[in-house]
């Protein structure tokens, strides 16, 4: 069996966040974790090539990335594609899932990957791949690789993977049963009435959606708050918010601040290249433009505090808990609406989860993020696409005046979203 392995820039040996923007390339044979996979597979398959792409480049150029990676994979004439494992890395998981989608649709061959259950790539792309459940981090590589290899061996032998060795794909298939449906239904009902254990044949999906709140009626009188999962904190990170899997959030006083500088603010986030945010934190938390709009009377007031956590790897449960507490505080201050910004993949999942909880509390909120598919999957209602993962509201390649103009345009789009009635999820392009 000919196998092509897809990896990101880190596991492909190119480098960390500073190389997350590299374009796709192909290398012969196994690379990085592919060496362990080769050993685990034995003679069941041969990794003929490895395709490597930077996480940020893939997610910021999704359609081009899928087409380019597909072309590189097609050249190798594989029988199967392996992606990852991605563990709980959100951008990596989304890239692995997108590769699975395009390969399964265009080449019609199986794709095997590995992800943590809360990786957003699972929910978005599970139907296109056999997804082996992994731990939260690469520390579980030792168990992930053998599990993926075992599943690949079954596919190579023309066998269906055993139930329980992969995450449910959400696909319905026809099967033959010994008893007709009416008899099985009555038996299940009797068990349920007696309080006995029973197993449904078709678990209903759970959709956690929050109806969008009415829009802000008059921006010129509205108090707007800034919230971020992008980790923007005062210099020195006084609350010691962790760079990954944050166990807390911070509430910080803006006072009369009208700009976030390299001397006063930084990011605590470990999920994206911090260079651009540390140079100008307004690229993640747009205080400068919001102050400008406040002075011009476009908004009534910028809330005196901002709220920040690190969304990188942060659990859904913690994101919900932080947002509920933040929402209660916002209500106490009579905040009318919220702009929430996010950066990387799991950060976007965290941010969108927080958006839903703030919305659930009755406050209209807009999510400004780059990885829009994650925000849509989680359930944010008002979404504004951002510039790039490490600088969602800026572009360091532009002169300062032009960059500020770009940021103002994005913030105005976010304010437009807050004043627009919506009856469901809406992306404001």
From Swiss-Prot:
Q: Which residues form a coiled coil?
A: none
Q: Which GO terms describe its cellular component?
A: glycine reductase complex
Its EC top class is oxidoreductase
**UniProt-listed Enzyme Commission number(s):** 1.21.4.2
* Annotated GO MF terms: glycine reductase activity
Q: Which organism is it from?
A: Symbiobacterium thermophilum (strain DSM 24528 / JCM 14929 / IAM 14863 / T)
Q: Out of the domains of life, which is the source? A: Bacteria
Keyword terms: Oxidoreductase, Selenocysteine
Q: Which residues form the active site?
A: 344
Q: Which reaction does it catalyse?
A: acetyl phosphate + [thioredoxin]-disulfide + NH4(+) + H2O = [thioredoxin]-dithiol + glycine + phosphate + H(+)
| Function per UniProt | In the first step of glycine reductase, the substrate is bound to component PB via a Schiff base intermediate. Then the PB-activated substrate is nucleophilically attacked by the selenol anion of component PA to transform it to a carboxymethylated selenoether and the respective amine. By action of component PC, acetyl phosphate is formed, leaving component PA in its oxidized state. Finally component PA becomes reduced by the thioredoxin system to start a new catalytic cycle of reductive deamination.
Signal sequence span per UniProt? none
What family, per the record? Belongs to the GrdB/GrdF/GrdH family.
The protein's name in its UniProt record: Glycine reductase complex component B subunit gamma
What do we know about how this protein assembles, alone or with others? Heterohexamer of two alpha, two beta and two gamma subunits. Component of the glycine reductase complex, together with components A and C. PB is substrate specific.
Q: Does the keyword ATP-binding apply?
A: no
């Amino acid at each position: 069996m000919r196998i092509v392995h897809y990896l990101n820039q880190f596991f492909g040996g190119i480098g960390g966040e500073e190389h997350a923007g590299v374009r796709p390339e192909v290398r012969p044979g196994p690379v990085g974790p592919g060496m362990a996979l080769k050993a685990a597979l034995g003679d069941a398959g041969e990794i003929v090539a490895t395709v490597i792409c930077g996480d940020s480049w893939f997610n910021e150029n999704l359609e081009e990335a899928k087409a380019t990676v597909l072309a590189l994979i097609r050249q190798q004439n594989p029988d199967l594609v392996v992606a990852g494992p991605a563990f709980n890395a959100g951008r990596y998981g989304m890239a692995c899932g997108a590769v699975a989608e395009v390969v399964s649709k265009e080449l019609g061959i199986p794709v095997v990957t590995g992800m943590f259950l809360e990786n957003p790539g699972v929910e978005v792309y599970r139907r296109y791949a056999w997804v082996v459940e992994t731990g939260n981090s690469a520390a579980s590589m030792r168990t992930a690789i053998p599990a993926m290899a075992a599943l690949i061996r079954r596919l190579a032998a023309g066998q269906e993977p055993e139930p329980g060795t992969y995450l449910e794909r959400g696909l319905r298939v026809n099967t033959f049963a010994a008893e007709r449906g009416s008899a099985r239904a009555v038996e299940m009902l009797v068990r349920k009435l007696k309080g006995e254990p029973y197993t449904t044949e078709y678990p209903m999906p759970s959709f956690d959606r929050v109806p969008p709140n009415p829009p802000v009626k008059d921006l010129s009188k509205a108090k707007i708050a800034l919230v971020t999962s992008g980790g923007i904190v005062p210099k020195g990170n006084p609350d010691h918010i962790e760079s990954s899997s944050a166990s807390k959030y911070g509430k910080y006083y803006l006072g009369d601040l009208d700009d976030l500088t390299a001397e006063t603010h930084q990011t605590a986030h470990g999920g994206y290249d911090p260079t651009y945010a540390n140079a100008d934190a307004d690229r993640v938390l747009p205080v400068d433009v919001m102050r400008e709009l406040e002075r011009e009377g476009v908004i009534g007031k910028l809330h005196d505090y901002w709220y920040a956590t690190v969304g990188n790897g942060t659990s859904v449960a913690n994101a919900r808990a932080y947002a509920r507490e933040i929402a209660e505080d916002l209500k106490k201050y009579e905040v009318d609406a919220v702009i929430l910004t996010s950066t990387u993949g799991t950060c976007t999942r965290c941010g969108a989860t927080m958006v839903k909880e703030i919305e659930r509390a009755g406050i209209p909120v807009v999510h400004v993020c780059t990885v829009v598919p994650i925000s849509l999957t989680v359930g944010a209602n008002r979404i504004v696409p951002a510039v790039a993962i490490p600088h969602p509201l800026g572009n360091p390649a532009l002169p300062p005046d032009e960059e500020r103009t770009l940021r103002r345009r994005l913030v105005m789009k976010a304010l437009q979203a807050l004043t627009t009635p919506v009856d469901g999820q809406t992306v404001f392009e």
